[in-house]
Amino acid sequence: MSNQIIRDHKRRLLVAKYELKRMHYKAICQDRNLPNKIRYEYFFKLSKLPRNSSKTRVRNRCIFTGRPRSVYKLFRISRIVFRELASKGSLIGINKSCW
């Protein structure tokens, strides 16, 4: 397992752990009906959360190779691995088209 896959997995765990807290803080920060003092306080709390707990830091990677580009979200595998597995018949319901 490559280091990038391990790092990405740790980020995914952090995102899951802090997701509700982050959503709560963001909702309070963006609520214009609240006083600025409270909004600023929650903005500060939001900035104190771990940086890797943000969803934008998670990268879709192939679960077999760790390749970060051209990954099919539905299968979480890269186009290269997808082609190999599809030609072997390892993916259920996927077959080469012919007409």
Curated annotation (Swiss-Prot):
Domain of life: Eukaryota
UniProt GO molecular function: structural constituent of ribosome
UniProt record, GO biological process: translation
Subcellular location(s) per record: Mitochondrion
Alphabetical UniProt keywords: Mitochondrion, Ribonucleoprotein, Ribosomal protein
One cellular component (GO) term of this entry: ribonucleoprotein complex
InterPro entries, per database record: Ribosomal_uS14, Ribosomal_uS14_CS
Cysteines engaged in disulfide bonds, as pairs: none
Stated family: Belongs to the universal ribosomal protein uS14 family.
Record PANTHER family: 30S RIBOSOMAL PROTEIN S14 (PTHR19836), RIBOSOMAL PROTEIN S14 (PTHR19836:SF30)
Name this polypeptide is given: Small ribosomal subunit protein uS14m
Protein source organism: Marchantia polymorpha (Common liverwort)
Gene from which the chain derives: RPS14
